[in-house]
UniProtKB/Swiss-Prot annotation:
Family designation: Belongs to the G-protein coupled receptor 1 family.
Keyword Membrane in record: yes
Pfam family, one: 7tm_1
Tree of life domain: Eukaryota
Record protein name field: C-X-C chemokine receptor type 1
InterPro entries: CCR1-9-like, Chemokine_CXCR1, Chemokine_CXCR_1/2, GPCR_Rhodpsn, GPCR_Rhodpsn_7TM
Sequence ranges on the Extracellular membrane side: 1-39, 97-111, 175-199, 265-285
UniProt-listed Gene3D superfamilies: Rhodopsin 7-helix transmembrane proteins
Biological function: Receptor to interleukin-8, which is a powerful neutrophils chemotactic factor. Binding of IL-8 to the receptor causes activation of neutrophils. This response is mediated via a G-protein that activates a phosphatidylinositol-calcium second messenger system.
Intrachain S-S bonds: C110-C187
Residue spans, topological domain Cytoplasmic: 67-75, 134-154, 221-242, 309-350
Length: 350
């Protein structure tokens, strides 16, 4: 029987967030020169992302849930997106704790937390693509009735969550906690003799559905949306274009580096490019850094999609006015200013 699943072969300190151990029988552990430094830098970064995401996405959900009257289709997407980003962020403290003492939470939590992290990662990215489709339909095909879109949006969101659950099932099925000799306990996949094949599948899934497909959908939809805005004589088209550019640019800046490094790591693990301890350590550090950059996207979503929008600002001020934190006169002045500065409501929910 092959010994590729023998935990003592693996360099457990070299596992990145994806938790995929090497499968080669001649695999030899490498010394990580910056393990302690990297560990605490990652913990601090996780904590900051958690706090910022918790604050921003909670505010977005609060504002949308308060404004039951006149809730738009985009608001439904934003609500689901904020929920996905919030649930994703809630797993970060557990992963941060595992950086200190290893995985001390047992197999059940290993499976559940891994599933939560993956489901909300996929659903967040897929919902971003759905928002771009919604903006494309609203601006490029403005004849589509609001009633039709409101009826469909619930099923689209359910579809995103369902697809995300299916894409995440391998992590739930195969992950377990293990405490190897002379090393900290870890949460990783046990894939048996098919480790190499399944590793490629588990790498292809986030590459495809977590980056490439959503990116092409956004580029297509926002590309045609920009073309329509250029042709139209709309007072708010320049503002809308700035938001669209911000959406695509932030997505690329956050997730492109991680996907490129993950691709390099996959090529190295499958022996397409030569593997060495120095290269493995460099890629491991790059994965840590670029992964944090990707996680930061969950904090930036509220800023891009909600805080920039005039509807969100007005809804937030309305909640403050209801609790006596701002005057109703100030709220009325803000409403008049928003109305006179946005004769076309095309960008308010972008």
């Amino acid at each position: 029987m092959s010994n590729i699943t023998d935990p003592q072969m693996w360099d457990f300190d070299d596992l990145n967030f994806t938790g995929m151990p090497p499968a080669d029988e001649d695999y030899s552990p490498c010394m990580l020169e910056t393990e302690t430094l990297n560990k605490y830098v990652v913990i601090i970064a996780y904590a900051l992302v958690f706090l910022l995401s918790l604050l921003g996405n909670s505010l977005v959900m609060l504002v949308i849930l308060y404004s039951r009257v006149g809730r738009s289709v985009t608001d439904v997407y934003l609500l689901n997106l904020a929920l996905a980003d919030l649930l994703f962020a809630l797993t970060l403290p557990i992963w941060a704790a595992s950086k200190v003492n290893g995985w001390i939470f047992g197999t059940f939590l290993c499976k559940v937390v891994s599933l939560l992290k993956e489901v909300n990662f996929y659903s967040g990215i897929l919902l971003l693509a759905c928002i771009s489709v919604d903006r494309y339909l609203a601006i490029v095909h403005a004849t589509r009735t609001l009633t039709q879109k409101r009826h469909l949006v619930k099923f689209v969101c359910l579809g995103c969550w369902g697809l995300s659950m299916n894409l995440s099932l391998p992590f739930f099925l195969f992950r377990q906690a293990y405490h190897p000799n002379n090393s900290s306990p870890v949460c990783y996949e046990v894939l048996g003799n098919d480790t190499a094949k399944w590793r490629m599948v588990l790498r292809i899934l986030p590459h495809t559905f977590g980056f490439i497909v959503p990116l092409f959908v956004m580029l297509f939809c926002y590309g045609f949306t920009l073309r329509t805005l250029f042709k139209a004589h709309m007072g708010q088209k320049h503002r809308a274009m700035r938001v669209i550019f911000a959406v695509v640019l932030i997505f690329l800046l956050c997730w492109l580096p991680y996907n490129l490094v993950l691709l390099a790591d996959t090529l190295m693990r499958t022996q397409v490019i030569q593997e060495s301890c120095e290269r493995r350590n460099n890629i491991g550090r790059a994965l840590d850094a670029t992964e944090i950059l990707g996680f930061l996207h969950s904090c930036l979503n509220p800023i891009i999609y909600a805080f920039i929008g005039q509807n969100f600002r007005h809804g937030f001020l309305k909640i403050l006015a209801m609790h006596g934190l701002v005057s109703k006169e100030f709220l009325a002045r803000h409403r008049v200013t928003s109305y006179t500065s946005s004769s076309v409501n095309v960008s308010s929910n972008l």
